[in-house]
Amino acid sequence: TPGIIAWYGSGDDGNPYNGSERLPQYNTPWAVSALGFGGGWTDIATWKVLGHNPGGLWGVVLHLKDISFMEDLKHTLRAGYYHGTNNSAMPKAANMASYPSRIDGPFAYLTTSDDAWELNADTRYKIYENLELAVEAAYVRLNLDEGTWGKKIVNEVDKDSYRVSIGLKYSF
């Protein structure tokens, strides 16, 4: 089943003293992608690479769900692109000495000069009626602007995040 998900979330302006213009958030996975926003089948952690909600960025995710060439075997493929909506003057105005590594995830604050992209491949195999095997692979690439964050921060931040997981689920 092909699908597309797109959104726009407001971001901060360049003034750190007039309150945040970002969308308020509740700390829960937003299952748009497997690694970036916490939609993975074996994902039990609350930490997400890109955060928990769409605040401060716009994005597009294309997916092909439930691809099947064999009975009881299904695949899902996703590709996502995310671009910040926070003003690129904010990091300097707020005296951010390092890239924010918030509880939402290390890539959770993107400015209008920053972007990230993600690829996911998920496979599920129903071994028995009550037993299912899942294999997930996900990769996120962060692209930070050196003019916004400075050379030191851009060079220090890990820009590649990936996960490969295998899980079994037994249903009673």
Residue positions per predicted region:
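Outer-membrane beta-barrel domain signature
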Residues: 48-53, 108-112, 146-157
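Extracellular/periplasmic loop regions
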Residues: 1-78, 83-108
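Outer-membrane beta-barrel strand-turn architecture
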Residues: 10, 68-70, 125-129, 172
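Residues that define the transmembrane beta-barrel architecture of outer-membrane proteins
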Residues: 56-60, 113-119, 158-164
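Residues on the lipid-exposed face of transmembrane beta-strands in outer-membrane beta-barrel proteins
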Residues: 4, 62-66, 121-125, 166-170
